């Protein structure tokens, strides 16, 4: 572990230990929290996480991620009750935490029928009908409908929290005024989520819950309550494991992952073999679907020069913008490329399109609409790199990793560059050297065999996993 990681996980364990007795309905609340958001506004602490001396201010020292994950594995086991009888004729519940599930409508319609599935949502909108049906044709149930008034209980818990904070005034996190406010807010919401989840599970026939993430308190709490009622849980992988912070700790019974990278990574932090299954992701099933628009039409719509090569450049707002400018400067004057800039999450033209005549906006076209008609994809260390390779496209990546970067793309070797000039030269080389194109193709295929083994559709693999985990259910 580097300094940042060691300090981060040590700080996390400080939190778990100090507040372990803060419980509601027998569940230790700190284990359910979204930890990082407890110090969102504590900028000094976030800077100090990279400092060697910061560890001297902490109570705990985490040297092994396995030991950290083990805490949550034991916590989950403590709240798992395999003796509870499930309701007969249970249905699969889909819970889209933080809008990260990303199941395309057509995939959901194909694999999740309304007689066997439903959607769990948090709150109702102002115009939500009493019994709403989603765009996929599935009934929706709202956790807020199963809530109760527990103000007195919340006040008692928050009073307990205040007493603990008073004892740890000198701690770099607990002693900061923004921590108490953030933690109290999560305490209240988690207590309500425990009530909502318990009441919903008691009243609805649920055979399995599929999550988009268990990183957030909303979904993590539901997953633990589900374990108490012997309901199996599956957590989909919503993006590449770029930063380990987004995937630790593991909470669901099974994490449905993209490929062998994640299997090996989860094993490295002590997760058992049966806790991880290679499923892929249902949205990727649409990547190689027949193009929805012709190249001629796209060329006209985007104002491309049909004689030039098309490069798709993936950016994220103004992140790394100085690097992208250097990249485009290298191509300025070459008069060989159309550079289509696709920003995320914005749909408006990126500022870079104003500075370079050969750079154009993607005009909101979906990634999978663009991929069939580009020659090369250039991106930062994002999931788009994997998606483009699944589409059979050469991918060249700019590497500016976070302190918790997992090394996901390391197997691509020189196709990943730290400097924009080197990245630009690599793309130039790809277009002029047949030998280099063959090398890139070989690297990409080997990478995909490890990162995304495409045996059968992900949607089908997920349905088979659900069937395996709910085997024997349906008996009263």
Residue ranges of each PLM-predicted region?
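Short N-terminal targeting/anchoring amphipathic segment
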Residues: 90-95, 186, 198-216, 312, ...
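Donor nucleotide-activated moiety binding/catalytic core segment of transferases
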Residues: 345-391
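Glycosyltransferases and closely related glycan-assembly transferases
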Residues: 86, 109-111, 198-209, 219-232
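Catalytic binding pocket for nucleotide-activated donors in carbohydrate/polymer assembly enzymes
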Residues: 250, 273, 278, 383-451
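Active-site-proximal region of nucleotide-activated glycan assembly enzymes
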Residues: 195, 204, 212, 224-289
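Conserved N-terminal ligand/cofactor-binding loop architecture of enzyme catalytic domains
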Residues: 1-195
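Conserved catalytic-core segment of nucleotide-activated headgroup transferases in glycan assembly
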Residues: 284-351
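C-terminal amphipathic helix plus adjacent low-complexity
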Residues: 1-26, 31-45, 431-476
